């Protein structure tokens, strides 16, 4: 299975934005971005000439891909689904990304990062409405109940993650029941709740050129 194996902290520095890809480390003084908030490489601190519109659009797409941990083929497919839906294509794209099961597992607090959430899903620790689902890209729907398998609930890492979720908060479209290791999808996510600085129109403009 294809995956991105590049250095995680370099991605944040490349985007000049903390993407919270390494869980608890991102909230500590060990965060590489906090210590070196400039682009990676020998000339990372140098001044660059003005970039083209295409480069800006491409960078925005790469940022969102890194944030959600999605590779190009799947990202493009998600965009095509967003474009086919009613409404604004860019907003639809972000909502589809938010509805991914690995993202919902992360948002609910079962994992400290989306990378860890993908591992939890793939290793068959997650149930949807009582049935095991091991597909990270699975789209959660309103009314779904996401829960941790009984055998997985003793995992100290998961317990720590649920305690730490208070630091970043749980979005209003999810309702967390920490005691029972469950999260209910109260509603579909909306654009206003995605607080990371994303200019989705740039992604739409980029794909419209192809």
From Swiss-Prot:
Role this protein plays: One of the primary rRNA binding proteins, it binds directly to 16S rRNA where it nucleates assembly of the body of the 30S subunit. With S5 and S12 plays an important role in translational accuracy.
Gene behind the chain: rpsD
Membership in a protein family: Belongs to the universal ribosomal protein uS4 family.
Native organism: Desulfotalea psychrophila (strain LSv54 / DSM 12343)
Gene Ontology biological process terms, A to Z: ribosomal small subunit biogenesis; translation
Lineage, top ranks: Bacteria, Pseudomonadati, Thermodesulfobacteriota, Desulfobulbia, Desulfobulbales
PROSITE patterns: RIBOSOMAL_S4, S4
Keyword Cell wall biogenesis/degradation: no
Segments forming domain S4 RNA-binding: 99-170
Quaternary structure and interacting proteins, as annotated: Part of the 30S ribosomal subunit. Contacts protein S5. The interaction surface between S4 and S5 is involved in control of translational fidelity.
Keyword annotations: Ribonucleoprotein, Ribosomal protein, RNA-binding, rRNA-binding
Listed name of the protein: Small ribosomal subunit protein uS4
